[in-house]
Amino acid sequence: HMSMDLWIFDVGRGLCVAIRSPNGYLCVIDCGRSDDFSPIEWLATQEWTRHKNYKLAKLIITHPHVDHIADIETVTNKLKPFMILRRKDLDWGKVISGGSDQTTVMKHFMKNYMPPEYNSTVSDADKPDWGDGFVLSSYCLGESKAAEISGTDSAYVNNTSYVTIITYQNYRIALPGDIESEGMAALLQESQRLCSAINS
């Protein structure tokens, strides 16, 4: 009997979601943590179907706010991903305008998960077969559109969030990162594919 498992961890601020696909592969969306609990450390102790010997088949970073990448060093040390989805095209002046570039978390993220790291496209043949018709689709606003509609640097980063739709059997699960209402409205307006994924 095939099934999917979904964990939404209570990490206070930020986010950490884990998905076990029907074929047993692990996908993690964001790597937040609380003061006393690291979902990444726990996930690293569990059994998963390995993809090319990686326990973590895919890591999605919705947007680079520190609370969404708080546990990135643990990812590197204990649960390094085979592939990562993250924005490479952002205005980094805005991303770090609050001084977050001074944090070890942001420094580590930029050094280990930005080009030239993880910078080649993964071919379809090299992607995991999640199994049983399970589909993971991510959508985002173009950088200039996010800049245009956002009143503050923080809103800009939020509005660059990947919105991920999990489609499995009769379920549609939307994980929108921290996209703000004006960002979601703009994304729905410009992405027919996102509308279809939600409504199909």
Spans of features found by a protein language model:
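Metal-dependent catalytic neighborhoods of phosphoester/phosphodiester hydrolases
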Residues: 69-79, 94-106
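Long, structured stretches of catalytic cores involved in phosphate-ester chemistry, encompassing
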Residues: 90, 95, 100, 193-200
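Proline-aspartate-enriched helix->loop->beta-strand connector
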Residues: 80-81, 200
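Short, aromatic/basic amphipathic alpha-helical patches
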Residues: 41-44, 96-115
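Core dinuclear metal-dependent hydrolase active-site scaffold
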Residues: 1-54, 119-199
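Short internal beta-strands
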Residues: 55, 82-92
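Metallo-beta-lactamase
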Residues: 55-67, 200
